[in-house]
């Protein structure tokens, strides 16, 4: 029997996964107590990471290969992926002006026995990729400007392992493999065995031009080896080998997928990205709530270790805009899986810059304190997640109740979050209404906002910083993560200089990520001039929110002292 212990109302069950083991001696859990729920989670995760010798998120930067906008073949083509079908989709992206930075060729590309679900060879299926995978990669890069191309693989080789008499086994060497109790041939548990498996395959993929990978089915390993290998034996060396080799061969550009079991996420030393949910289910719109809840609540822990992948989405979908909003707030890879003819550039516009770069928050969005222990599918208030971007806080509300609309409540969502720096008043910008509202401390917290039906969403920006200046740059307001599109300070001498500042005014220079509609918060109506590349531009004022169309990236703001 698996050992267990109960302390008060807290019960811990411990299992080894290996038959015959009757005693365990190790740290099984970390517990922290405090007023800040995010801080106590962070403390526990940091302790666990130190104990296991793995990096926390601050030492796992998002790989450059996955930082732009991507497209994955899975929900578009499934296992019927081919070079011809990929090129058809790329033609659509080019015609619609969608800048795709990376392409992930998912399950179906490799040489497999589809009935036995085993891996035959380490190369591409010759019928689907008749001129080889490298030809497809070259087309994507040279004809369509795709910068990075990745492929899918399973942690165990393929769903049921490797074909015993296949070319893959001959190339890797049978001595580097092991047979499970039900006859599946998989990479062996020692680091040397796992390294030989992945070194052989990743090296071949690099020769084909592949520079990122998605490794699926990771938490299946302990199930496949149940009774024979403990959780640690099933995962520690296999993950260590994979992580280090992907870091060496591909700069760490890997999506860890279906690896949300503790034996997986506690044993990856350095890889940066992990999926935080089950698959996006595009044909079942009712799955929205479950998908978002999985991602947001799992991110409470995962964002302390990894860059969170909230999975692909469709831009033509009943809840496309809400899915896009949530992917923007994931702080991880952002990619769609649209089928041919189904991409809606209008949904992608707020997510991306014109060159395919993706503005991101500092960390993945998580539920606000008031939502941590509530069931959002039946609550009166709309569900809310929060993420930060510099001194701005983003609040995204989503209707989660399929039976009735839910009310946006800003004061409730902010309760328990850190106060505005310096104890000042909060200002909230409603992105949809393009208005700004002052939230005074002690104001009526019963005041309510709009209603959201199931799948509807609304985004707010909250200034959490100090009031060192009269105006607060928000950024390109047409982009979801607007604060990530502006930086205070400019790197040249254009615009306002000391010679043309008035004695009774002050000024600030900012740099935009690209030209566009720039927004700033001006609570006391002190802004007197906005210049783009030295030229004064018209400013549209809606209360405390000011907006100006800028055709350059250098912007200078001047206000009354």
List the model feature ranges, each with a label.
Residues 64-229:
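Aromatic-lined carbohydrate-binding/catalytic grooves of carbohydrate-active enzymes
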Residues 442-480, 541-561:
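C-terminal beta-strand-rich structural cap/linker in extracellular carbohydrate-active enzymes
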Residues 425-445, 531-546:
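Solvent-exposed beta-strand/loop surfaces of large extracellular or lumenal domains
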Residues 1-102, 120-127, 143, 148, ...:
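Carbohydrate-recognition beta-sandwich/jelly-roll modules
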Residues 162-203, 207, 240-345, 366-367, ...:
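Glycan-recognition surfaces
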Residues 77-81, 110-114, 156-162, 220-224, ...:
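Flexible loop/turn segments at secondary-structure boundaries
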């Amino acid at each position: 029997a698996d050992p267990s212990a109960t302390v008060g109302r807290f019960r811990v069950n411990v299992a080894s996964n290996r038959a015959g083991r009757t005693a365990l001696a190790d740290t099984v859990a970390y517990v922290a107590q405090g007023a800040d729920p995010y801080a106590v989670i962070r403390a526990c995760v940091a302790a666990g990471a130190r104990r296991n010798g793995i990096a926390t998120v601050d030492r796992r930067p998002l790989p450059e290969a996955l930082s732009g906008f991507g497209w994955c073949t899975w929900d578009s083509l499934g296992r019927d992926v081919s070079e011809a079908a990929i090129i058809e989709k790329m033609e659509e992206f080019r015609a619609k002006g969608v800048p795709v930075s990376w392409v992930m060729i998912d399950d179906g590309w490799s040489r497999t026995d589809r009935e036995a679900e085993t891996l035959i060879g380490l190369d591409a299926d010759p019928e689907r990729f008749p001129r080889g995978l490298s030809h497809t990669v070259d087309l994507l890069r040279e004809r369509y400007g795709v910068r990075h191309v990745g492929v899918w693989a399973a942690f165990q080789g393929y769903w049921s392992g490797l074909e015993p008499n296949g070319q893959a086994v001959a190339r890797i060497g049978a001595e580097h493999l092991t047979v499970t109790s039900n006859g599946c041939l998989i990479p062996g548990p020692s680091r040397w065995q796992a390294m030989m498996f992945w070194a052989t395959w990743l090296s071949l993929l690099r020769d084909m031009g592949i520079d990122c990978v998605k490794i699926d089915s990771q938490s299946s390993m302990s199930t496949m080896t149940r009774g024979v290998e403990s959780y640690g034996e099933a995962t520690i060396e296999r993950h260590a080998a994979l992580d280090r080799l992907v870091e060496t061969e591909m700069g760490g550009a890997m999506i860890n997928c279906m690896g949300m079991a503790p034996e997986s996420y506690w044993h990856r030393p350095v890889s940066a990205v992990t999926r935080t949910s089950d698959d996006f289910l595009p044909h079942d719109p009712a799955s929205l709530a479950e998908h978002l809840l999985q991602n947001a609540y799992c991110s409470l822990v995962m964002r302390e270790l990894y860059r969170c992948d909230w999975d692909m989405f469709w831009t033509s979908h009943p809840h496309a805009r809400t899915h896009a909003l949530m992917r923007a707030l994931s702080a991880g890879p952002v990619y769609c899986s649209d089928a041919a003819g189904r991409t809606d550039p209008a949904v992608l516009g707020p997510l991306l810059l014109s060159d395919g770069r993706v503005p991101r928050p500092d960390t993945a969005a998580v539920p606000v304190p008031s939502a941590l222990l509530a069931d959002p599918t039946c609550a009166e208030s709309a569900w809310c997640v929060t993420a930060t971007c510099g001194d701005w806080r983003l609040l995204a509300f989503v209707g989660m109740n399929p039976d009735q609309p839910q009310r946006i409540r800003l004061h409730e969502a902010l309760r328990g979050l850190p106060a505005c720096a310096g104890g000042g008043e909060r200002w909230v910008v409603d992105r949809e209404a393009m208005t700004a509202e002052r939230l005074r401390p002690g104001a009526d917290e019963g005041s309510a906002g709009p209603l959201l039906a199931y799948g509807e969403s609304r985004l707010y920006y909250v200034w959490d910083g100090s009031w060192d200046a009269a105006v607060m740059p928000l950024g390109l307001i047409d982009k979801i993560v607007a604060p990530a599109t502006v930086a205070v300070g400019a790197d040249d001498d254009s615009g306002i200089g000391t010679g043309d500042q008035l004695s009774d005014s002050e000024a600030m220079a900012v740099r935009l990520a690209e030209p566009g509609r720039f927004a700033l918060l001006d609570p006391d109506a002190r802004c007197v001039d906005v210049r783009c590349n030295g030229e004064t531009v018209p400013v549209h004022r809606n209360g405390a929110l000011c907006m100006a169309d800028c055709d350059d990236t250098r912007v200078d703001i001047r206000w009354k002292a």
